Amino acid sequence: MDSNSVISQIGNTPLVRLKQASELTGCNIYGKAEYFNPGESVKDRAALFIVKDALKKKLISKGGTIVEGTAGNTGIGLAIVCREYGLKLKIVIPNTQSIEKKETLKKLGAELIEVDAVPYSNPNNYIKQSKKIAEN
């Protein structure tokens, strides 16, 4: 992967000294500024690992499709990574998610499948729906 690609920046986030926590504990406490990832979340790391691992194990190849049930930042991370690797992404998402999140996912190339927001115990829950779609 090109060192100037978007995904080459995943994980290259700075450590920042947490001043108040350091002073309270008497030792230096640092936090990783994960919001500097391209998708502004630690979930970018998980998405990159999952996709790279699936490609390495030949569970998917270029042009293939990943199906994910997500209402959060994992979807944005996956959309960024899938776009870089030439993979298609279908995201099953509750229809209660913000318009901004849905538009971001679409602009990153994800196909959205919106479903009613129901409890996990319901067979129509977005996570269970994504499993059904992936199995077909």
Question: Model-predicted segments: where are they?
Answer:
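PLP-dependent amino-acid enzyme catalytic core
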Residues: 1-136
